[in-house]
């Protein structure tokens, strides 16, 4: 069965902001480099995570892991750092703007791409402030140049 991303679909919601404790950064030996393009997908919608993982796999990326919320993402990166992180802005108990700097501190050098179904644009100043490298509306995931976003 073939899957795709419905450009009309809307995922997620806008939650309140909460903080997380800081995690120690991954050491270079913790980063996985046996294949190019190890990705962590952080999104509360299991259907979106599944579709995104299939799309990334079809583009020869290796989906290292998936997280349904910020706390789970922080636990996952404590053990091993991905090369890139697709991070939903709207998550239960937190948001991508708050979580991005914590993930960037835990995994220096990992590309962080914020994604959202409810927001179409994030100014560059906001991306820089929250330590994200790029923003991509979820509706554009299937047509975006993910190789450039995730490995540039």
Short names for language-model regions:
Residues 42-43, 67, 85:
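Conserved sequence signature across two-component system core domains
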Residues 46-65:
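Two-component/phosphorelay signaling modules centered on CheY-like receiver
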Residues 69-72, 95-98:
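Acidic catalytic/metal-coordinating carboxylates
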Residues 88:
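Active-site residues of response regulator receiver
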Residues 92:
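The feature encodes the CheY-like receiver
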Residues 97-109:
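Short amphipathic alpha-helix used as the core "switch/output" element in two-component signaling
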Residues 98, 119-136, 140-148:
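Alpha4 helix (beta4-alpha4-beta5 surface) of REC/receiver domains from two-component response regulators
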Residues 115-116:
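Hydrophobic/aromatic residues positioned on beta-strands within the core alpha/beta folds
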């Amino acid at each position: 069965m073939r899957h795709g991303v419905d450009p009309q679909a809307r995922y997620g919601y806008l939650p309140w902001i909460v903080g997380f404790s800081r995690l120690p950064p991954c050491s270079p030996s913790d980063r996985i480099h046996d294949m190019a393009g190890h990705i962590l997908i952080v999104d509360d919608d299991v259907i979106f995570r599944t579709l995104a993982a299939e799309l990334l796999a079809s583009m020869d990326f290796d989906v290292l892991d998936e997280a349904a919320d910020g706390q789970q993402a922080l636990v996952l990166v404590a053990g091993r750092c991905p090369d890139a992180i697709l991070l939903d802005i709207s998550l239960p108990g937190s948001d991508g703007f708050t979580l991005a700097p914590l993930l960037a501190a835990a995994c220096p050098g990992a590309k962080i791409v914020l994604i959202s179904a409810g927001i179409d644009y994030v100014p560059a100043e906001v991306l820089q402030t929250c330590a994200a490298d790029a923003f991509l509306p979820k509706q554009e995931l299937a047509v975006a140049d993910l190789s450039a976003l995730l490995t540039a």
